[in-house]
Each structure stands twice: as structure tokens, then as C-alpha cells.
């Protein structure tokens, strides 16, 4: 899928170097089709790295996508130049009246903070409610998945003493679910989180299905029956070195993190990571775009129906 992004966005050169098709605004304007409108609410500290990871995964099907990068507040991120934020990001207030075919809400390094103590929690809940009226299908990743479960269903995560870190084996629970079309019966995916919600709690919610899970780390992909919400508790978007970088960062900060499981050869951090999740990660995003976004969204987004309120 050619993704339509602003000229000069740093991710463009990275993606072109990987032979991933991007399209500038002028060329896109000459295609006589309606592109999908997808927003990315980027909560990660390193905005540029996350942009590359997600744009890479959005690029693999044959439809055009307009991508809006959205910020949740005006505080300057520690790991991204302010000039980048000013050039490429929309404040939520500037898109509040817009409707989207799809929205991705990223994870955030807030695992050990109570939701109500998060500085932008009030804005976060406003956006969660806004998405019910303005977005056809929303994909929540890691922290955002747990935060949305808490807001919509009152389900509280537990915080583990030791972080889930590594690449874990998962199984397909519902092979007929379109999100998992083309998946192997078992597959691997990265996780990096302290928070955990027991699978039984997801199953207790009417209209939600745990379509893929792990014996080690629990529910991985949870989907609403109406396709309007998808909760992914891991990080299918991660680059090969992301878990390694997080591990080394925590060590440098004086912590004693666990060595990421199933990631280094012989559990030796001096070796190169074993990458065994990228094909399924790409397939998950492709299936979401095709079956949960493109196949269900109205051609005229002004006709987008308000989602019924989740039952708490």
C-alpha cells in the first residue's frame, strides 16, 4: 500500500531505502480514488523510530493511505527534536472534527504509573471517547490496549515484579477471524511490559474475543466482534534491535532487567537478536487495514456511525 506522507519526513528516506513504496502529496492527488484516512496517536518518546516502524507496516497492501501523526500534548519529547514535532505533528485539537477510517494508538513507557496519575490521562480519555464517534476501527498497542480496557470496561491490569520481555510463542484461538488470515497456528511476537490482564477478564466482556494468546504471557490479540476495536498487548511493530536497546538502556540506568527471552542466541546479549516475528507482525497490520478498516468503512466518512458504548 503506498502511504502518503509529508515530504521531508525523516521516515521517508528510511522506507525508500527498504524498497517500501511511499507517495508524495502531488502524486497522490492525481490518483482518482479515495485514500484511507489513518491517524497515529504517537505516545512513544522516540517519535521518529516509532513512525518508521508503523509506516513500514502500513505499506504492504495496494490502497493509498493518508497518515496524520497526532500528538497528545504540547510538551517537548525528550528524544525527538521540537522542529520535527512542529513540522509533522497535529495537535489533537486540530483534528478533533475530522473522521478517520483507522486510528493507531501506540504504547507508552508508563507501566508503573497509575492511569489517573498520567499527566495527560484526561486528554487520553477524551480521545478514547472521541474515537468511538470519529474512527471506524482503532488499533491499541501495549500500554494503550490496557488503558483502553480500563477506561471502557473498568478492567484493571496487575503489575508484575518482573517485566515480560522477549519474543514469545503464541497460538491462534480463532483461525476464522480475519485478523489472523494467513497466520500459522503458532507464531512469535515481542512483548515488553510489566502490566498484565488475565485472559479470563477479556473473556468476561461481551463482544470481545481473545483471538490469539500465549501460554507464557497471556492474551495477545483481542478483537471486538464489530471490528471497531483491536487490542494488541505486545509490540509487533518492533525493529530487530528494539528489545536489545531497551535492555541495554535499563542496565545503563542501574536496573537489573531480565534478559529478553527467545531473543539472543544462548541468552547471550553479545550475540545478534533472533528475529522471528516480522512476517506475522506485517500480516496483522495488513489484515487490520483490509478487513477491519477498508472492508467496513463508509466511502463517505461523514456517514460513519457512532459506535455503541462499551458495556462496563
Curated annotation (Swiss-Prot):
Substrate binds at residues 163, 192, 249. The record marks 192 as: Important for substrate specificity. The active site is at residues 142, 235, 237. Its EC number is 2.3.1.46. The record marks 111 as: Important for acyl-CoA specificity. GO terms for biological process: L-methionine biosynthetic process from homoserine via O-succinyl-L-homoserine and cystathionine. Its main location: cytoplasm. One of its GO terms (molecular function) is homoserine O-acetyltransferase activity. InterPro entries: Class_I_gatase-like, HST_MetA, MetA_family. It is found in: Cytoplasm. Keywords: Acyltransferase, Amino-acid biosynthesis, Cytoplasm, Methionine biosynthesis, Transferase. Pathway: Amino-acid biosynthesis; L-methionine biosynthesis via de novo pathway; O-succinyl-L-homoserine from L-homoserine: step 1/1. It catalyses: L-homoserine + succinyl-CoA = O-succinyl-L-homoserine + CoA. GO terms for cellular component: cytoplasm. The keyword Cytoplasm applies. Transfers a succinyl group from succinyl-CoA to L-homoserine, forming succinyl-L-homoserine. Belongs to the MetA family. This is Homoserine O-succinyltransferase. The lineage of its organism: Bacteria, Pseudomonadati, Pseudomonadota, Gammaproteobacteria, Alteromonadales.
Amino acid at each position: 500500500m503506498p502511504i502518503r506522507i509529508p515530504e521531508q519526513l525523516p521516515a521517508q528516506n528510511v522506507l525508500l531505502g527498504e524498497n517500501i513504496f511511499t507517495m508524495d502529496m502531488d502524486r497522490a492527488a492525481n490518483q482518482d480514488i479515495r485514500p484511507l484516512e489513518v491517524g497515529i496517536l504517537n505516545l512513544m518518546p522516540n517519535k521518529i523510530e516509532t513512525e518508521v516502524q508503523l509506516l513500514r507496516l502500513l505499506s504492504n497492501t495496494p490502497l493509498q493511505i493518508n497518515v496524520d501523526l497526532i500528538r497528545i500534548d504540547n510538551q517537548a519529547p525528550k528524544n525527538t527534536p521540537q522542529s520535527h514535532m512542529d513540522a509533522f505533528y497535529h495537535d489533537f485539537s486540530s483534528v478533533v472534527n475530522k473522521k478517520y477510517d483507522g486510528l493507531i494508538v501506540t504504547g507508552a513507557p508508563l507501566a508503573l504509573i497509575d492511569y489517573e496519575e498520567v499527566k495527560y490521562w484526561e486528554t487520553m480519555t477524551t480521545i478514547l471517547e472521541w474515537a468511538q464517534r470519529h474512527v471506524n476501527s482503532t488499533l491499541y498497542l501495549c500500554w494503550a490496549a490496557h488503558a483502553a480496557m480500563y477506561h471502557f470496561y473498568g478492567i484493571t491490569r496487575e503489575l508484575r515484579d518482573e517485566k515480560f520481555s522477549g519474543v514469545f510463542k503464541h497460538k491462534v484461538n480463532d483461525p476464522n477471524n480475519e485478523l489472523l488470515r494467513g497466520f500459522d497456528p503458532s507464531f512469535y511476537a515481542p512483548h515488553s511490559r510489566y502490566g498484565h490482564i488475565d485472559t479470563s477478564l477479556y473473556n468476561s466482556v461481551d463482544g470481545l474475543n481473545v483471538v490469539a494468546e500465549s501460554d507464557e504471557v497471556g492474551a495477545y490479540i483481542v478483537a471486538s466482534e464489530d471490528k471497531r476495536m483491536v487490542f494488541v498487548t505486545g509490540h509487533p511493530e518492533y525493529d530487530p534491535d528494539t528489545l536489545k536497546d531497551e535492555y541495554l538502556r535499563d542496565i545503563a540506568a542501574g536496573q537489573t532487567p531480565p534478559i529478553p527471552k527467545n531473543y539472543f542466541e544462548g541468552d547471550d546479549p553479545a550475540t545478534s537478536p533472533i528475529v522471528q516475528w516480522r512476517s506475522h507482525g506485517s500480516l496483522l497490520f495488513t489484515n487490520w487495514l483490509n478487513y477491519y478498516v477498508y472492508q467496513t468503512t463508509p466511502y463517505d466518512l461523514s456517514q460513519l456511525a457512532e459506535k455503541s458504548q462499551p458495556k462496563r
